[in-house]
């Protein structure tokens, strides 16, 4: 499938012709404003989600029981054995 050459592009370099550049010029500022608005809203949603909803303290009130060193060594050996298998 061969693309037909556009009259708004140079057939040798595929760059826009001066006519195409002139046709797009009035829309440039509006497009940049829309892009800025879209990126701003998206960034704001991500910022809000990460910073305000990321405060995960569900288990902050659950105390962690102390563990003695022998039990810790036994758990480490068990973990290493499962890791190798």
Curated annotation (Swiss-Prot):
Q: What is the organism of origin for this protein?
A: Saccharomyces cerevisiae (strain ATCC 204508 / S288c)
Q: What is this protein called?
A: Cytochrome c oxidase assembly factor 3, mitochondrial
Asked if Acetylation is a keyword of the record, the answer is: no
List the transmembrane segments. Answer: 27-49
The terms describing its cellular component in GO are: mitochondrial inner membrane; mitochondrion
Spell out which residues lie on the membrane's Mitochondrial intermembrane side: 50-85
GO biological process annotation, one example: negative regulation of mitochondrial translation
Q: How does it assemble?
A: Component of 250-400 kDa complexes called cytochrome oxidase assembly intermediates or COA complexes composed at least COA3, COX14, COX5A, SHY1 and SSC1. Interacts with COX1 and MSS51.
Similarity remark: Belongs to the COA3 family.
Misc remark? Present with 2530 molecules/cell in log phase SD medium.
Q: Which UniProt keywords apply?
A: Membrane, Mitochondrion, Mitochondrion inner membrane, Transmembrane, Transmembrane helix
Q: Which residues lie on this side of the membrane: Mitochondrial matrix?
A: 1-26
* Organism superkingdom: Eukaryota
Q: How does it sit in the membrane?
A: Single-pass membrane protein
Q: Where in the cell is it found?
A: Mitochondrion inner membrane
């Amino acid at each position: 499938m061969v693309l037909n050459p556009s009259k708004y592009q140079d057939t040798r370099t595929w760059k826009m012709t001066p006519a195409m550049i002139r046709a797009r010029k009035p829309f440039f500022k509006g497009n940049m404003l829309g892009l800025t608005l879209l990126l701003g809203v998206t960034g704001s949603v991500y910022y809000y989600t990460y910073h305000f909803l990321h405060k995960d303290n569900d288990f902050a009130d659950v105390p962690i029981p102390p563990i003695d060193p022998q039990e810790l060594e036994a758990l480490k050996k068990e973990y290493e054995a499962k890791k190798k298998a």
